[in-house]
């Protein structure tokens, strides 16, 4: 509690919501001391922490690594602990990497998510200078005349396990991550210009790896920024 007032607000919120996710999953600090898989060495607490973040605006500490590391320290976890920045895809990339480690048996469980706060005006100065912000205060994704987006704030954290482990342990299962894919747009007409074909390739790869028929997809959440470039 003495440190809470001075640490990075993103660090504080991610820790708070990580704790809430752990409680919702039915775990305590003690029950998270999960032993390594059979035949593997290592200390108990084989739970990874993966935090996605876009901007580091709180310069008193100057360390985004602490967003994930503080959770691992507080819960006495010995799995991978990393904070990563891939801009708008940061939280999804964190979940992708968490799932990869689970599938490869490197961890027994994972705490993954993202946090994004706007706590300094320099962020808006940069976005405005790059013509990312909407001129009328509204985001018109997929609409005619859109010229930018309005940044939001938020934090979200989930607890992930292999399906077989979750079923064996009687966990409440909210949903399944069947597959995920990660790539880059490469060289385009400009550094901030998206590559539609690369995005389509990532979607197709995830569908193929997950064995999902695209015709059976019932809900899509898109990254529709509403900028002039899409």
Can you describe what each PLM-predicted range is?
Residues 1-230:
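Condensing-enzyme catalytic core of the thiolase-fold
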């Amino acid at each position: 509690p003495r440190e809470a007032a001075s640490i990075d607000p993103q660090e504080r919120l991610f820790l708070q919501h990580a704790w809430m996710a752990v409680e919702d999953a039915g775990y305590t600090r003690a029950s998270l001391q999960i032993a390594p898989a059979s035949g593997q060495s290592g200390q108990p607490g084989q739970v990874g922490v993966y935090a996605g973040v876009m901007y580091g605006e709180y310069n008193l500490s100057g360390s985004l690594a602490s967003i994930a590391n503080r959770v691992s320290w507080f819960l006495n976890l010995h799995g991978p602990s990393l904070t990563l920045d891939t801009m708008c895809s940061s939280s999804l990339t964190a979940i992708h990497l968490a799932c990869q480690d689970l599938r490869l048996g490197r961890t027994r469980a994972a705490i993954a998510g993202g946090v994004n706060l706007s706590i300094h005006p320099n962020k808006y100065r940069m976005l405005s200078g790059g013509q990312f912000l909407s001129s009328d205060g509204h985001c018109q994704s997929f609409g005619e005349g859109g010229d930018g987006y309005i940044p939001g704030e938020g934090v979200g954290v989930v607890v992930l396990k292999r399906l077989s482990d979750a079923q064996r342990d009687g966990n409440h299962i909210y949903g399944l991550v069947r597959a995920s894919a990660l790539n880059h747009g490469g060289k385009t007409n400009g550094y901030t210009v998206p590559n539609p074909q690369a995005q389509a390739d990532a979607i197709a790869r995830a569908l193929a790896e997950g064995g999902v028929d695209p015709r059976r997809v019932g809900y899509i959440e898109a990254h529709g920024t509403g900028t002039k470039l899409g």
